[in-house]
């Protein structure tokens, strides 16, 4: 019985050691920021595809907070404004998207 209790304690300790402490903020790494930006862009595009253009703005703006030069975020936001007939804002974001392209 004592052996079982000791074994259970050791296994519990080992498992607890395998759990990440979660102290690393994923937005502090380039990879984490890119993943967050891409997730926000996909969420915004999803809302736009569902016809929720106004709702798409929030995640797309968050993507731009993470990466203000994201061509994809600017292009998606331009589509949102175009859908809402906000032509000046759409034009602004289309131009930002074009100037932000890495291969331009």
Each model region followed by its residue ranges:
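Bacterial Sec signal peptide processing site at the extreme N-terminus
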Residues: 15-35
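Structural marker of alpha-solenoid helical repeat scaffolds
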Residues: 32, 66, 99-101
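Residue-level recognition of tetratricopeptide repeat
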Residues: 36, 70, 103-104
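Register position in tetratricopeptide repeats
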Residues: 49, 83-84
